[in-house]
Amino acid sequence: MDYPTMTLAEIEAMPVAGVADKDAHLYLWTINRYVEQAYSVARAWGFRPVCLLTWAKTPRGLGLGGAFVQTTEHILFARRGTLKALRREPSTWWNWTRPEAGTGPKHSRKPEDFQTLVEAVSPGPRLELFARRARPGWTVWGNEVEANK
């Protein structure tokens, strides 16, 4: 990886429960290999898992091993308290365009359309952990973002 990683225990120990509102939504990105752990993290942070959302990416070659080419990433949607959604979304999967960085895709970069979806479904305030860029109306935290703007 071209960025530092954390263990499951380190992620579960993050003080998210202490900074999230008592009524809040959580959108937790994961990949197929770590779906079970995502549920554990959500619960450790005081959230109740509700459903798994899927980003179905257009394939780009065969990638690394296994019987199936990994062309999906997932977002575990979880709730804490009774925060109502702003609208009901008619799908749990999307084929968003892959974000590009320079001459090609950047590993782990998430599509802007995802944040637009969050803004349409979940009331603020909004916090993004491990952010790569600032976004108006969001508080961001991450070692790749310059400052919260």
Residue ranges and their predicted role:
Residues 1-149:
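Class I S-adenosyl-L-methionine-dependent methyltransferase catalytic core
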